[in-house]
A protein has these predicted regions:
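Activation segment
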Residues: 13-15, 58, 129, 153-155, ...
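Conserved beta-sheet core of the metallophosphoesterase superfamily
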Residues: 98-200
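Structured loop/turn residues at beta-strand edges in well-structured enzyme cores
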Residues: 43, 72, 139-140, 169, ...
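Conserved residues at the C-terminal ends of beta-strands
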Residues: 51, 147, 222
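Cysteine-centered metal-binding/redox modules
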Residues: 198-252
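Single, functionally critical "micro-switch" positions that shape active/binding sites
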Residues: 7, 147, 226
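Core catalytic region of metal-dependent phosphoesterases/phosphodiesterases
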Residues: 2-108
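A short, polar/proline- and glycine-enriched secondary-structure boundary/capping micro-motif
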Residues: 16, 129-133, 244
Length: 252
C-alpha cells in the first residue's frame, strides 16, 4: 500500500480549464483525463489524500460517478469548493460504493510516514505546526502540504518565501495542475522541498527552477510542472536580493 497526495482536481469545473491553462477542451474531457491519470498512478490498495476542491458540482449522482471510478481509498481535506460534497456525505446521499471510497474527511490532517510528518490543509499555512522546531533538526522531517493557490502569483510568492526563510519552510503545493494532473508520492513532495537547498544565491535557485537571463522557461520548483503559460515559473512574483536586503541570501 502506498500513499499519495493531490489537490484541486475540480472535477466538472469548466472555468478552471482557462484559469489553470489546463490542456483540455471541455469539462468532460478533463474528467476523463483526470480519472485516467489518477488510475495510472494509484493502485487499488493505495490511499490518496485529496487536499480540497475535489469537484465543483454538489450533485450526489455526479460525485458518486467520479469517485466510483478512482482507484484507492480517498481521505479528504475539505476545500472552499467542497460544500456540496460535504453536504452529500453528511446526508448519506452518495452511493454505497462512493461512500466507502471516501474513507474519511476532515478540515485538517497530520499524518506520519517513514519518520516524516505531513501536515495537510487546503490552504497554505506558513506558520505550520513544528515550523520552528530547530532543536535536533526535527523541522526537517515536517512538511506542510496544501492546495488552493493553483499556478498563480500567490503560489510563486509562497514558494519564494518558503525557501529563503531560516530555517526554510517545508511547504509544498500538491495541486494537480503542478504535477501533471497526478497524485504524487511522499518522496516527490520531499524532493520538491529539498532540491533548492544548497543554493549559493537567488540566481542559482532561479536557474534550478529553469529561469535564466532569457526569462522564464515555464518550469517550476523541483518536479513541479506548471500548467499555465500566462503565469509560468516566477512570472507572478520574482524575488531578487534588492527586494529583501535584510536576509542573508548568500548562505542559502
Amino acid at each position: 500500500m502506498a500513499i499519495r497526495f493531490t489537490a484541486d482536481a475540480h472535477f466538472g469545473h469548466e472555468n478552471v480549464i482557462a484559469m489553470d491553462g489546463r490542456p483540455f477542451g471541455s469539462a468532460e474531457e478533463m474528467d476523463e483525463e483526470l480519472v485516467r491519470r489518477w488510475n495510472e498512478t494509484v493502485r487499488k490498495g493505495d490511499i490518496v489524500y485529496h487536499l480540497g476542491d475535489f469537484a465543483m458540482s454538489g450533485e450526489p449522482e455526479y460525485l458518486s460517478s467520479i469517485a466510483e471510478r478512482l482507484n484507492g481509498k480517498i481521505r479528504l481535506v475539505f476545500g472552499n469548493h467542497d460544500s456540496g460534497l460535504r453536504r452529500a456525505m453528511r446526508n448519506g446521499r452518495l452511493t454505497a460504493k462512493a461512500a466507502v471510497k471516501f474513507e474519511d474527511a476532515r478540515d485538517y490532517r497530520e499524518v506520519r510516514h517513514d519518520h516524516m510528518k505531513f501536515l495537510m490543509s487546503h490552504y497554505p499555512m506558513p506558520c505550520y505546526n513544528g515550523r520552528h522546531h530547530t532543536k535536533n533538526r526535527e523541522n526537517e522531517t515536517i512538511f506542510m502540504l496544501h492546495g488552493h493557490v493553483h499556478a498563480t502569483p500567490e503560489h510563486d510568492m509562497i514558494r519564494n518565501l518558503a525557501i529563503f526563510q531560516k530555517p526554510a519552510m517545508q511547504i509544498v503545493n500538491v495541486g494537480c495542475m503542478l504535477w501533471d494532473y497526478r497524485p504524487i508520492s511522499p518522496e516527490q513532495a520531499v524532493s520538491a522541498c529539498r532540491m533548492a537547498r544548497g543554493c549559493a544565491s537567488v540566481g542559482e535557485c532561479l536557474r534550478k527552477w529553469g529561469m535564466g537571463d532569457e526569462g522564464c522557461s515555464g518550469c517550476a520548483f523541483g518536479s513541479y510542472r506548471l500548467g499555465a503559460d500566462r503565469f509560468g515559473c516566477m512570472k507572478g512574483f520574482q524575488l531578487t536580493a534588492d527586494m529583501i536586503p535584510r536576509l542573508d541570501l548568500s548562505e542559502r
